[in-house]
Amino acid sequence: MAFLKKSLFLVLFLALVPLSICEAEKREEENEEKQEDDDESEKKRGVVTDLLNTAGGLLGNLVGSLSGGER
């Protein structure tokens, strides 16, 4: 009976070790994917900001030239 208990514990241990290793690798991959997503959204935010700044500058120049021409 003691032999069966030891065998069962050994089997459970050998099953849990690879499982925990797989979970750790999965967490690392998820963290890498999240970091990549954050980097991409940061780039998109930069592009949108640049577009808004350019559009604002163009509108400012247009309004300035229109109001300057009426005087």
From Swiss-Prot:
GO biological process: defense response; killing of cells of another organism
UniProt signal peptide: 1-22
Keyword field contains Cytoplasm: no
Compartments reported by the entry: Secreted; Target cell membrane
Stated consequence of mutating residue 63 to F: PD36KF; Gain in antimicrobial activity and small increase in hemolysis potency
GO CC terms in record: extracellular region; membrane; other organism cell membrane
InterPro entries named in the record: Frog_antimicrobial_propeptide (IPR004275), FSAP (IPR016322)
Cross-referenced Pfam families: FSAP_sig_propep
Keyword Iron among record annotations: no
Modified residue annotations for Glycine amide: 68
Similarity comment: Belongs to the frog skin active peptide (FSAP) family. Plasticin subfamily.
Name of the protein in its database record: Plasticin-DA1
Organism lineage: Eukaryota, Metazoa, Chordata, Craniata, Vertebrata
